[in-house]
Amino acid sequence: MKRIVCLALFLSMTGCTTLEPIETPAQENATTVVDAVEGDKAAQESSGIIDTLRDRTDPIAGDPAWAPINPKKKQEHYAAATGSLFNANHIGSMYDDSKPRGIGDIITVALDENTRATKKANADMSKSNDASMEPLAVGGENLELGKYNFSYDLSNTNTFAGDASANQSNSISGYITVEVIEVLANGNLVVRGEKWMTLNTGDEYIRLSGTIRPDDIDFENTIASNRVSNARIQYSGTGVQKDMQEPGFLARFFNVSL
């Protein structure tokens, strides 16, 4: 008992019992590279009961996440200050135009994507079991119990055959012009852009974002889509034609239930 009293007195004198709990700062949501390029999809809200039933939110033209960047002033050199008037990062050739290297510069991307995947699997399995026993014989005669003897003959066969195949192909070609939204420390350019086309019963759009090397841009200020790193290409549409290509709410509900 004396030890407990002494320990309590010691803690009260040292002030350990009056220490306030350390407050841990709340976790801050950082902006990822994907959010910076494509926008935060978690912040998108449904436009009504139609989008709720369709289980999707259609993109809109003029989305701030895809808005162009218009610099208010000329960007400074992205190379470290060395005191020299010569900058190796801005060397131009006598036979081509100056290449985009700053925020807001425009680059044309030639879309030429062809992908194809084929998969096929076959499975055949079989198993058979046989078991038998001759009648018991005692003294040269079969041992019987009424009409039955002690013999049996069992056989079992299990077979399974499965065949699965999948074939998928995608192709897109065309052009889209994008803008530089960021210049990385190594000189690579982060680009982003979209194109909207209004049709009779809806809109079609193409969106592209990714990272490119200035050296891959040709003399026509064009770069192939297969030269874009971390490329995200979207080609879809909105409106009646888009809705007709998807099953309705009840069809999706019963398919999930089954």
Curated annotation (Swiss-Prot):
Primary localization: membrane
Sorted UniProt keywords: Bacterial flagellum, Cell outer membrane, Lipoprotein, Membrane, Palmitate, Signal
Determine if Signal is one of this entry's keywords: yes
Q: Name one GO molecular function term.
A: cytoskeletal motor activity
Q: Where is the lipid attached (N-palmitoyl cysteine)?
A: 16
How does the record say this protein sits in the membrane? Lipid-anchor
Q: Where in the cell is it found?
A: Cell outer membrane; Bacterial flagellum basal body
Which InterPro entries has this protein been placed in?
Flag_Lring
In its keyword annotation, does this UniProt entry include Lipoprotein? Answer: yes
**One Gene Ontology biological process:** bacterial-type flagellum-dependent cell motility
PANTHER family per record: FLAGELLAR L-RING PROTEIN (PTHR34933:SF1)
Q: Which family does it belong to?
A: Belongs to the FlgH family.
Q: How does it assemble?
A: The basal body constitutes a major portion of the flagellar organelle and consists of four rings (L,P,S, and M) mounted on a central rod.
Task: Return the protein name.
Answer: Flagellar L-ring protein
Q: Per the UniProt entry, what species is this protein from, by scientific name?
A: Vibrio atlanticus (strain LGP32)
